[in-house]
C-alpha cells in the first residue's frame, strides 16, 4: 500500500505570548502522539521548541506558524516566521550554551532543513521530520 500524506493542521502563535513555547509543545505533542512512540514525541517536541525559540530570538516576526502533518510513517513539522534570518556568531555574549540550536534540532529528528528568505521575500521555514521506528 502506498504511503499517504495527510494535510497538516496549522496554528499561529503570537511571538510575544508568554505561553508560546508551552502552547507549541502541547500542539505538537497532541498532533504527533497518535503516530509516534513517546520517546520520539519527546525528541520532536524538543526540536520544535528550539526552532520556535530561535524564531522568537532572531526573527523579529510578530507570529510563528507551526504545522503538523503526517507523511506515511512520519510526522512532519514546519515552523515558519516572517522575519529576516540572521546568522549568529559562534558564541553569543560569552554564553558557551548559545548557538547550538541547529545542531540540537538536527540530532533530534530523522530529517531537518532550513530555508532562509531573502531581503525581497522575508521569512524562515524550518522543516523537521520524525519517523516511527
Residue ranges: model-predicted function:
Residues 22-49:
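Conserved short strand/loop->alpha-helix "switch" segment adjacent to the catalytic nucleotide/phosphoryl-transfer site
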Residues 55-59:
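Short helix-loop "hinge" at the ATP-lid/N-box region of the Bergerat-fold HATPase_c
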Residues 76-102:
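Glycine-rich/acidic phosphate-handling loop/turn and adjacent ATP-lid/helix
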